[in-house]
Swiss-Prot record:
Name recorded for this polypeptide: Ribonuclease J
Required cofactor names: Zn(2+)
A Pfam family the protein falls into: RMMBL
Gene field: rnj
Keywords: Cytoplasm, Endonuclease, Exonuclease, Hydrolase, Metal-binding, Nuclease, RNA-binding, rRNA processing, Zinc
Positions bearing the site annotation: Substrate binding: 60
Amino acid sequence: MENQERKPRRRRRRRPQEGSQGGPQDHVEIIPLGGMGEIGKNITVFRFRDEIFVLDGGLAFPEEGMPGVDLLIPRVDYLIEHRHKIKAWVLTHGHEDHIGGLPFLLPMIFGKESPVPIYGARLTLGLLRGKLEEFGLRPGAFNLKEISPDDRIQVGRYFTLDLFRMTHSIPDNSGVVIRTPIGTIVHTGDFKLDPTPIDGKVSHLAKVAQAGAEGVLLLIADATNAERPGYTPSEMEIAKELDRVIGRAPGRVFVTTFASHIHRIQSVIWAAEKYGRKVAMEGRSMLKFSRIALELGYLKVKDRLYTLEEVKDLPDHQVLILATGSQGQPMSVLHRLAFEGHAKMAIKPGDTVILSSSPIPGNEEAVNRVINRLYALGAYVLYPPTYKVHASGHASQEELKLILNLTTPRFFLPWHGEVRHQMNFKWLAESMSRPPEKTLIGENGAVYRLTRETFEKVGEVPHGVLYVDGLGVGDITEEILADRRHMAEEGLVVITALAGEDPVVEVVSRGFVKAGERLLGEVRRMALEALKNGVREKKPLERIRDDIYYPVKKFLKKATGRDPMILPVVIEG
């Protein structure tokens, strides 16, 4: 028995934990469902084996050619299918393009409640709670977990997240160091490297440098301003310029900026208080964001905020009004003031209007229309770049170079930008001697597989956009949008035909050329002839409808050069 060979005991294979190494076939899948090749709808899925965490869940705003559409949100079929694998949802900050989609996405994926932890900083969760309540959801039904912008989170068995504070155009903004069994990923989140932020809280680059020293497998970084050379101006520079122009304004001052730009609003309030002006706010989103920021201590006022009614009878030099409308939105306060449609107040000569913002791509014409109207009403209008009253919240080229140098990643994925921004970031990296093949240009819906040695696109998941129209989500198709554009551009002609013993036709046009009685009379005659023939020959209603549609379409095109939407409605009498 003593000489009998002993069999080695089989050891149980341990699952990889934080800092441990996965097997040679292990990989992380990175799946952007929004935010690649576009501005907005930011949401990214990270998966290792059977565990997922999601980063952000944003929305986008409709472009000019999307009539009737209120919001755009990303399709999340993949997350609905794999909901049981989701271990956490992590929010980098409270901007709409990062959390605005959650009141729609959370019920789609989880229903009206979920135990999955949703991590966010204090202001971020404060804004999210307000959004959930606004859409009839109970914040308490979702597992909202407050963290600081520099916390560590253990997500499931495989992901350890070290958040790091990054300056941006909203407080409590973070990037994330993602430690996985195969290596480290650094995600910058939205950022700029502001040396003198309004709240004094600078970017925590020590964590970025530490990750770089340990070795970064993949860098995912903000490409928004990759075309801009130099550095993005500090928010404190903008505060000084706002102080200067508000101090010199002779009459009332109106300021518009993004409602979520708490630091900019704080700068305006400081200047108003310095020069003895009472601050009133007008506009739903401005009031909502500021109320939450005040309650949570992110916005400070010496006195209090006033209503329009309280300041309208004060001397002009004692009044400052913060208003919505930085993007020229038709129902915003500034737009209504510019077009003399505001019920409580009107622009008058001697007023100063400050646009402390820059137009989002696609909104330039709307903003210019508002500016021109304000000038026509006698206001002084101050806007960038003529006045230094706005700075971007995103890093320019020299700041992006610093992040690349601190992390020296093996692989690189430019994120948060249109294709031109991504490409310019790629070229910037190549100018620093990075191999071109180590950088991928991200696409929504792509599945990227990251191993210790490779980073490649290996497939796609269902992706795209859902249109939000009032209470409807996803029930607007591209075909419906095309119909709406057609009606908006060419107009509508409705032909109502009653098929019976005594056929009757009525014709109504909207948004079409000024159709005289002769033109509409000819349409009515053609439709009535087709209707009578159809009734006599006992044709199906669909066939009668076609017999009306095609001749009328051809006639109107020839007579007017226009191609209106023609809607024949044939009713059996």
